[in-house]
Amino acid sequence: MSTLLEKTRKVNRILQKTGIQPVDFNEMASILKDVIEANVYILSRKGKVLGYSILKDYGNDIFAQSKIIPEEYNDKLLRVTETLANDKGNLFKEDKILSDLILTIVPVNGGGDRLGTLVLSRGVKEFTDDDLILAEYGATVVGLEILRSKNEEIEDEARKRAVVQMALGTLSYSELEAIKNIFEELNGKEGLLVASKIADKVGITRSVIVNALRKFESAGIIESRSLGMKGTHIRVLNDKLLEELEKMKR
């Protein structure tokens, strides 16, 4: 039988992957399931099921069946501010399945904020002190991974915005006017462009429009496909483009 130290080391392996592989909350839940020997559910602060792993199927479990749990369930979880161990039939009295299970609820915190909730369930056997130590350590690891995924998202947003700003900076005045009018005409993330129509409207040549589109395409901001006489189909790949163009109108 694995000792507490051996089990802790298994959980710690999740951290060793940090920065090497994308966050996989199902894998994290699976590791916690194996070391704690319980069903494990990782939820975001808003009640989204980030990942889960089932040791034993107890029926139509709301946490496993939903991508986002009902708001009233999540509100109850968020009211749990410290580990609630071995709850049976108190927290979810109205739920026939959950009220028959032994639940342990561990808040997931990080950076001074509530990031989510770790929910553990069993049929009969209560959670021991060793189980609770592993659960709380697991919640800490989950919190670090949620923070990392949030930081990666922020970094990706900043990178996409920087690419758009640099591409806009390479445009001449005429090309910038062409781009503004093109996406005003499209009125969305994709559509059909008739270059001659824009050229007449802005008072520029078609070559200016072509050059502007090429710069954006080479930067990976848009993709375009010629439809011959019908025009050119344009699709926005970087959604920060529309945000930056909108700012220019203010």
Swiss-Prot record:
Entry GO MF terms: DNA binding; DNA-binding transcription factor activity; GTP binding
Segments of this protein annotated with the region GAF domain: 1-147
Residues passing through the membrane, by range: none
Major localization class: cytoplasm
Summary of the function given for this chain in its UniProt record: DNA-binding global transcriptional regulator which is involved in the adaptive response to starvation and acts by directly or indirectly controlling the expression of numerous genes in response to nutrient availability. During rapid exponential growth, CodY is highly active and represses genes whose products allow adaptation to nutrient depletion.
Cellular component annotations (GO), alphabetically ordered: cytoplasm
Family to which the UniProt record says this protein belongs: Belongs to the CodY family.
Subcellular location: Cytoplasm
Entry's Gene Ontology BP terms: negative regulation of DNA-templated transcription
Ranges of the DNA-binding region feature: 195-214
Name of the protein described by the UniProt record: Global transcriptional regulator CodY
Lineage: Bacteria, Bacillati, Bacillota, Clostridia, Thermoanaerobacterales
Keyword Cell membrane: no
UniProt-listed Gene3D superfamilies: 3.30.450.40, Winged helix-like DNA-binding domain superfamily/Winged helix DNA-binding domain (1.10.10.10)
This protein's UniProt keywords: Cytoplasm, DNA-binding, Repressor, Transcription, Transcription regulation
Pfam families: CodY (PF06018), HTH_CodY (PF08222)
